[in-house]
């Protein structure tokens, strides 16, 4: 049990004490992350507002930035936020979608003259012309905590104002 507890602290999952004992004899480990032990797609599990931003403001901004996002991650953000922060949603036809691309690593919408975006930390910071060293310490800590636990942090902004962080993670199957 003590060995399993130490592994959990390092984000390693062991299903039995025998597995922990056998791991002592392992010299090479090859992992196949295709959904064997997880559902295989990252899901939104939390949002963390920036200092001075309410959870409602972040939730609405992240929801709008995700409404036109057809990816599994985008759909999970919408699903999560519809429960957490219900709001009157605009008709998707009134949104101008900005699709995710590997080059920009951003997505979002333009709606009623406002620019809603979410994306990878470095990409979103470049989009709003903010250096990583100028990022609020509270957001830096949250981004690092999410990444350290194996999650994916996404920053959210509206009209260049950082609203906070979305926590995406691959959920382990029961």
Predicted regions and their residues:
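Conserved catalytic phosphorylation-site environment of P-type ATPases
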Residues: 1-67, 86
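Short glycine/threonine-rich catalytic loop with a Thr-x-Gly-x-Asp
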Residues: 67-73
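General structural feature for long, well-ordered alpha-helical segments within catalytic domains
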Residues: 22-25, 73, 77
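Long, highly charged amphipathic alpha-helices
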Residues: 57-61, 76, 138-141
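Signature of the cytosolic headpiece of P-type E1-E2 ATPases
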Residues: 73, 81-174
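N-terminal sensory regulatory modules of PAS/LOV and PAS-like folds
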Residues: 42-43, 77, 121
């Amino acid at each position: 049990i003590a060995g399993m507890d130490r592994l959990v602290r390092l984000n390693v999952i062991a299903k039995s004490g025998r597995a922990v004992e056998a791991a002592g004899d392992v010299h090479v480990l090859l992992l196949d992350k295709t959904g064997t032990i997880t559902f295989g797609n990252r899901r939104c599990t939390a949002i963390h507002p920036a200092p001075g931003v309410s959870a409602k403001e972040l939730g609405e901004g992240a929801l709008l930035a995700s409404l036109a996002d057809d990816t599994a991650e985008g759909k999970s953000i919408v699903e999560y936020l519809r429960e957490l922060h219900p709001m009157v949603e605009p008709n998707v036809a009134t949104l101008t979608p900005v699709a995710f691309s590997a080059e920009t690593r951003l997505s979002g919408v333009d709606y009623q003259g406002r620019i809603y975006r979410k994306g990878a930390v470095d990409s979103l910071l470049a989009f709003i012309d903010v250096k990583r060293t100028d990022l609020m310490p509270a957001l830096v800590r949250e981004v690092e905590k999410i990444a350290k636990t194996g999650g994916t942090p996404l920053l959210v902004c509206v009209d260049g104002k950082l609203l906070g962080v979305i926590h995406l993670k691959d959920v382990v199957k029961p």
